[in-house]
């Protein structure tokens, strides 16, 4: 059979076409996200809200606004952001460990994964309703903010709750669509887009502070150096691996004899990625935000106290944030990596770690190595998230230059680029396979 001219080009073009479609879908989804962040909740005076957020600079409210992509400052329907979904995911994942029924469902494979996802959606709905009620009832009672809600009453409460819940559920659906039909993790990309959208105004505000003399030029230079240093360090660690040597003994399958081979099992230093930072932020933001909204009301003074203790830079905030990061590093790594399963797969394929017996001993060895790596990864994420926060608080620069936001931006970009490269390589691999098949037919 003769080789058809231009078929290789068409195969390569088809692979690039798939990549192009996925990229365009991600871009389109992010455009929708940005448009939605400008659609306001009816009945709120945006000018008064902007004044409120100006007073809340450097507090947990500004941090919440950063994660929502500025939607909170515009009283948008996306003001809750994707945080209720993340909180629900944390709760469901924890329950799959401690609840026998959910643990069994999780073991059912694809069908179990779909059920867990469905429960997460239900949890998101409940948390979104709870948080939206908190915001809707808390806004009219904010101290010194008369006129924030133009006409407080049942109509406003109902409209605000429906708008906020609908916005969160839409963002959850949009994130799932990006994961399925786009590139990368949809939820991480939405958070990334929210942070990046606020970077230009934050940079402009910082430069303006330096120009007016409110911020010393050397401090501005130090901030720039810190940002580049953190970015470099994140890239360096995220690409770091611990390679366990794996040997394949000489074996025979049918009539073919395979010679002994040596390779390695790569284990990332930070296997959990950016998830611990996002989960920890969600855990801190949820009670702190509710306390901030309700704290001004009569009889809720104890919530004001909690809100003050949970502000960025406070000892309790630092302790809880660091503890949450370390916990979620170990928890999420245990979810995505199973040493026993890895050891069993090595044993089935005839591979072994030199000096370690296959099976149980190999599983224990891999688990020990992974535990040490996870500890290093947890300390690294804690350092990245907290040290720049202290410096940011001392220099009075926006949250966008903090360690958490920089970590999320850098890691999401790296994961995105890695998936783009994977898609391109898979399209080239398919093209090579088709080419090999055509050569076989032509003989």
From Swiss-Prot:
The keyword Cell wall biogenesis/degradation does not apply. It is found in: Cell inner membrane. Keywords: Cell inner membrane, Cell membrane, Membrane, Protein transport, Translocation, Transmembrane, Transmembrane helix, Transport. SecY that is not part of the protein translocation apparatus is degraded by FtsH. Also degraded by FtsH when the SecYEG complex is jammed, or upon treatment with antibiotics that block translation elongation such as chloramphenicol. It is a multi-pass membrane protein. InterPro entries: SecY (IPR026593), SecY/SEC61-alpha (IPR002208), SecY_CS (IPR030659), SecY_dom_sf (IPR023201). Residues 61-70, 71-76, 77-96 dip into the membrane without crossing it. Residues 1-22, 97-115, 179-183, 238-273, 330-380, 414-443 are cytoplasmic. Its main location: membrane. The keyword Transmembrane helix applies. Residues 36-60, 132-164, 201-223, 288-313, 396 are periplasmic. GO terms for biological process: intracellular protein transmembrane transport; intracellular protein transport; protein insertion into membrane from inner side; protein transport by the Sec complex; SRP-dependent cotranslational protein targeting to membrane, translocation. SUPFAM superfamilies: Preprotein translocase SecY subunit. GO terms for cellular component: cell envelope Sec protein transport complex; membrane; plasma membrane. Belongs to the SecY/SEC61-alpha family. The central subunit of the protein translocation channel SecYEG. Consists of two halves formed by TMs 1-5 and 6-10. These two domains form a lateral gate at the front which open onto the bilayer between TMs 2 and 7, and are clamped together by SecE at the back. The channel is closed by both a pore ring composed of hydrophobic SecY resides and a short helix (helix 2A) on the extracellular side of the membrane which forms a plug. The plug probably moves laterally to allow the channel to open. The ring and the pore may move independently. This is Protein translocase subunit SecY.
